[in-house]
């Protein structure tokens, strides 16, 4: 979802996270703040040693509280628990604040791996070696 608009690839993953992520060895995490769900992220398994995090969303009313950082750190931890070697992400150039966070956490710019389904809107691909 980019600026509130669903892209062609989004409806299936948003409406069927069980099939899109969980049944394929992935995970979905939610963030609670003041007893409310205010954020989420999906962790998609690309292969035995590789994951991609996707669909990171934080409620605008709770941004700048470190929630995105905590969700990404949870993804990193789960990847390590599953003995993954790399964590990937796709993003657009319209999200410079997110890019700063990704760099701070240890992600770097890379070319897409062959097992990644690159979305039409993707303008930047990043990876963290674990």
Regions from the PLM with identified roles:
Residues 85-88, 92-130:
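C-terminal "cap" of GNAT-fold acetyltransferases
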Residues 1-54, 59-60, 72-74, 78, ...:
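Acetyl-CoA-dependent GNAT
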Residues 36, 51, 59-73, 80-82, ...:
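Conserved glycine-rich acetyl-CoA-binding loop
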